[in-house]
C-alpha cells in the first residue's frame, strides 16, 4: 500500500478521535452501565484508535525516509523518555493493574496525540484542514447541547441516559444552591466544560480575526454562534478556574497581536484593570451572585465542606506526599485510577503536583519540558498560522487552570489541545523543511 493511502487512513482515524472525544463523558457512562469488566477498554477507545492510527504513519515515514525529521525534534525524544520512565515506574512500584493501566492512559494520551498529529500533518500538511473540520464538528455538538441545557432542557435531562452520582452527575450546583445549576454538556463535568470552552473561544476568536473579511454572511453568523455558545458554556459551567483561565488566555491572545512598542501600555492597562476589578468584586461580595459563585458562600444552606477547603486540603496533602517521596508514588496512585478496586484513593487538585505524585520530580520536569517545547513551537509559528496564536493563548489559560485542577486528566481537553498543537507543529515543520514532503502553503 502506498504512503498516500496510509496517510488517508491515519487522517480518518485521527479525525474520528478529534470529533468524537467530546462525547467521552456520555461514552464513559454507557460503558460503566453496560460494558462491565470491559468498561476501561471502552473508555480508552480514543487512545486505542490513536495507537492504530500511528501504525500506518510509521510505515509511511519509512517509505518516505522521513525519520530524520523526528530524530531532530526534541519533543519526540522527550515523549519517548517519558514513556520509558513510566515503564520503569510501573515495574518498580506495585499498584493494582487496573489503576496502572488507567494511569498510563491518562498520563501519556496527550503526548501520543501530539506525536500522531505532528507526524500526520508533517507528511500531509493539507490534513490540518480536515482535523480542524473534525474539531469544529465536535465543538458544535458540545456548545449546541450546552445551550440547550441552559435554555430548554430540564436540569436532570441526562439522568435518563444513566447519569447519576454513581457514574457522572447529570448536573451540579454551586454550593448546593439550586439557583446556580452547573451544566456538563457531554463532558465529564462542569470544570472540564469550562476548560474546553476556553480552548474553543481562543480558536474561534483567532480564526475570526484572521478570516473575517473573507467570510460570507452565513459563515460569520455560524462563527458568532460558536463564540456565543462557548461563552454560554463557560459562564454556566460556573467554573472559577475556567473563568480565570479565560482571562489569562484572552490577555495572551491580545498580546500576540499587539506591536512590541505597545506591550508596556498593555501591561499597565491590565494591572489597572485587575486592581479595579478586585475592588469591585470585593465591594460586591455580599450580593447573591458574587457571594455564591465567586466565594461559594451560600448563606441559606450550602455544603458543610466547602470546595475552597477541599482545594486547600488537597494541596497540603499532595505537597506533603511529594516532599516525602521525590521519586513519586507510582503510576495510577492518584486521581480516578486510585479509586479502583484495591487502590488507595488520592485526589490531587493541582496538575503539577498530580504529575509529581505519580512520576516524581523527574517526571514532572520532563513533562514541563515537553509542554514548554510545544508552546515554543507555537510561539515560533504565530506569524505563519492563526491557529498557533489560538493554541498558545489556550495553552496559557489551561496551564493556569492546572494550578487548581488536574486539567490534563480530562480526555476531551487534553486530546483536543495536544492533538491540534501537534498538528500545527507538523504543519510548521513541513512549511520550513528543505525539501518539504508536500506543499504547505494553506493557512486554513
Locate predicted features:
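Long extracytoplasmic/lumenal interhelical loops at the membrane interface
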Residues: 285-291, 295-359
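Interfacial loop-to-transmembrane-helix boundary motif in multi-pass membrane proteins
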Residues: 3-14, 18, 72-83, 118-161
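A membrane-periplasm/extracellular boundary helix in multi-pass inner-membrane enzymes
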Residues: 144, 150-154, 237, 254-302, ...
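Transmembrane alpha-helices of multi-pass inner-membrane enzymes
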Residues: 247-250, 391-403, 407-444
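Hydrophobic transmembrane alpha-helices and their immediate junctions
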Residues: 254-255, 358-399
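Loop-to-helix entry and N-terminal half of a specific, functionally important transmembrane alpha helix
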Residues: 13-20, 222-229, 379-405, 416, ...
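Alpha-helical transmembrane segments of multi-pass inner-membrane proteins
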Residues: 54-58, 129-257, 373, 379-380, ...
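N-terminal hydrophobic segments of proteins, predominantly signal-anchor/transmembrane helices
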Residues: 8-31, 49-108, 112, 398-399
